[in-house]
Design a protein with these regions (language model features):
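Cytosolic, long alpha-helical scaffolding segments
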Residues: 1-219
Length: 219
């Protein structure tokens, strides 16, 4: 009986450590996205390079989470809900890592292009701020098992999609430069993809809470 309690306590400690890791990964990813938006109007390219280098830390965090989940599944043989939690954690970690990649790609673009069109920058910044707000609210939804907020966050991705379409469907040349226009469209695409990854995380959280896929709910 004592051994069982010790094993259970150790297992719960490992789960808590996993929670901390995924929160840390989320915070670092949030910070990278925030910095990538700021660097669009930053005159110092060195800041963009710092973001690019930080992507390696995100990759390491995701790798460590994957290793811990595999170890827990192998050694503990978790029950259904815990297994669902671990599989969701794996997928969420992957989504965070991809978001960080997109943020790093935005920073890379800043090292080769400068955007002076205020209207363009405003729309790009708005896309980024909408994504950051979705991430912030998603953290609250996960902590409180708030399914209504999860669904609302998924719906809010439409606002990012609309801004993306406005940018890529613009007929005028940004700064009268085809290269700059192309780079701006890429930034918008990366921000749109960040929104998509947030939607994916929302659906993983919905699945963990309910045991059902979000698509099943909609149908």
């Amino acid at each position: 009986m004592v051994n069982t309690m010790v094993i259970r306590k150790r297992y719960e400690g490992q789960l808590n450590e996993l929670f901390k890791d995924i929160r840390t990964l989320g915070l670092h990813t949030y910070s990278m996205i925030d910095q990538s938006i700021r660097v669009l109007t930053d005159s110092q390219i060195t800041h963009a390079r710092e973001i690019i280098n930080n992507d390696k830390k995100i990759n390491k965090l995701e790798f460590d989470i994957n290793e811990k989940v595999v170890m827990l599944i192998t050694k503990q043989q978790p029950m259904a809900k815990d297994l669902r939690l671990m599989m969701s954690t794996l997928k969420i970690a992957s989504e965070f890592e991809r978001m960080a990649d997109n943020a790093a790609n935005i920073a890379k673009i800043r090292t080769r292009a400068k955007f002076t069109d205020k209207y363009l920058v405003m729309r790009l910044e708005t896309m980024g701020r909408l994504a950051l707000l979705m991430l912030k609210d998603l953290n609250d939804a996960a902590k409180n098992d708030d399914l209504d907020l999860v669904k609302e966050i998924i719906d809010r991705d439409n606002d990012i999609d609309d801004l993306y379409k406005q940018i890529v469907n613009s007929t005028y040349l940004i700064d009268n430069d085809p290269f700059v226009s192309g780079q701006a469209h890429l930034v918008a695409r990366y921000l749109e993809r960040i929104g998509d990854h947030i939607v994916n995380i929302s659906e993983h959280i919905y699945y963990f809470i309910t045991g059902e896929r979000y698509e099943s709910y909609n149908n």
